[in-house]
Amino acid sequence: MAVMLALLALSMLIFPAVTMDAAAQACRLFAGSVLPGLFPYMVVSSMLLRRMKPPLPALLILLMGWGGGSPAGAKLIHAAGGLPSRQKSRLLIACSALSPMFFLGTLAKWLASPVCGGIALFSVLTSGCLAAAFAGKGLSTLPAKQENHRSLSLQEAVESSARTMLLVCGMTVFFRVCAALLIPPFPQGRGVILPVMEVTAAVEYVCQLPLPPGWKTALVSGVAGFGGCSLMMQNRSLCP
């Protein structure tokens, strides 16, 4: 691991233009596509969740997680508390899709079709539910942990959500830079490197391909359903 980190740091120093350009692109994409839809919902949903009496129904947590998408869903699931480990894991899998506002807003604009954005959203949510149903059979069950459950003020909710958004931005920038440094040695692997590393950059790349809308929608659904390292690490950080 130390060798890999040293090589990564050296690559950043040798290719500063690539590093800075990738980081700038990630920040622009985050500010224009992720932050506007995710931050306001995260503030409101966190305040709402903490004003409900636990234990909360799993269906309610699932619906709220779907509304925010990933990683807001992971934060809500962790904040809910009182969930057995198996149920918690299944909810995390089912809520691993990106925000509906990303699909119906940003993605629909990139594909020039709200219908395609809706189809992609439905596909990702359905596949997440199926994966959660099958994955839950092999998960061990641990007793629920009772969390400290008190109401959040607006100031606390905004502060907590802002810290979360900083984490999301940081992960997005880091993995976008990693992808940018890997692509020049393996130019033919761009279509694999981006989905593995950073999902929003991969979705943007797919939308720019000279393909029919149906193919783009199918590819975007697969890429968004997988999530990539950036989204996985965000979820792991917010719901350990």
Q: Which ranges hold each PLM region?
A:
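Hydrophobic alpha-helical transmembrane segments of multi-pass small-molecule transporters/permeases
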Residues: 6-9, 26, 30, 43, ...
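Small-residue-rich segments of transmembrane alpha-helices in multi-pass membrane proteins
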Residues: 6-7, 33-41, 98-100, 196-200
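Selected transmembrane alpha-helices and immediately adjacent juxtamembrane segments
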Residues: 5-18, 23-35, 39, 121-186
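Juxtamembrane transmembrane-helix boundary signature
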Residues: 38-60
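Alpha-helical membrane segments and immediately flanking helix-loop junctions
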Residues: 56-111, 193-209, 215-239
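Alpha-helical transmembrane segments of multi-pass small-molecule/ion transporters
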Residues: 41-42, 89-147, 172, 176, ...
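Transmembrane helix-loop junctions in multi-pass membrane proteins
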Residues: 13-24, 47-54, 105-115, 178-187, ...
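Transmembrane helical segments that form the transport core of multi-pass membrane transport proteins
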Residues: 154, 158-224
